[in-house]
Amino acid sequence: MSAQISKLATVSDGAILGEGVAVWDFSKIRENSIIGDHTLIGDYVYIDINVSIGKNCKIQNSALLFDPCVLHDGVFIGPGVILTNDHNPRAISNTGAKKASTDWDKVGVEVFTGASIGAGTVCIAPVKIGNWAMIGAGSVVTKDVPNFALVLGNPARQVGWVGKKGLKLIPLDDSNFLCPVTNEKYSLSNGILSEMANK
């Protein structure tokens, strides 16, 4: 099954789209970007040059993903999310001259497997969003987010942990947590939450 591309979308000849990719109306995918198998791109999405997106991702309407961001497999990007690439943005240099593309160092956002970024969130590069982390809608992320962390607000702060199902985990004690639906257990050690061997 080849990619399904809306006639109203713009996809550069230099972009690589995997099997089963869907690109909806008025989205733009730039050259040298890579979109993994079965990823869905909503309406009015902008994917910059050199962006890498894994398999089975969902990029919702009006999201803006700037070079050099990387999304691993199974990432959810909500409507209106912005992944930035310039920590010190300026239109002109200190001399007043117009800045060229070589006048600044691009920095990126990296989103790891299974993570979700809620609608209207802005991630200020450089940041890394850990595996299965969840960012609440409307957040402004200014620092790295640990695996399974639940963060929200401006600036985004951690308010708990979530499991792979995306639900807030119930603390059993200071270092053990439980998913209220799947009964999967997680263990916290040195600030790192890990999934336990669930049987």
Feature roles, as predicted:
Residues Q4, D13-A15, A22-K128:
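Flexible, glycine/small-residue-enriched loop-and-beta-strand segment within the central core
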Residues N88-R90, R157, K185:
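Active-site/binding-pocket entry motifs
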Residues N131-M134, V140, Y186:
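Internal alpha/beta core interface subdomains
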Residues N147-G153, V162-P171:
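Short, intrinsically disordered, charge-biased short linear motifs at domain edges
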Residues Q158-W161, F177:
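Cys/His-enriched microdomains
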Residues G163, C179-T182:
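Short cysteine-rich clusters marking metal-coordination/redox-active sites
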Residues K185-K199:
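Short metal-binding segments enriched for Cys and/or His
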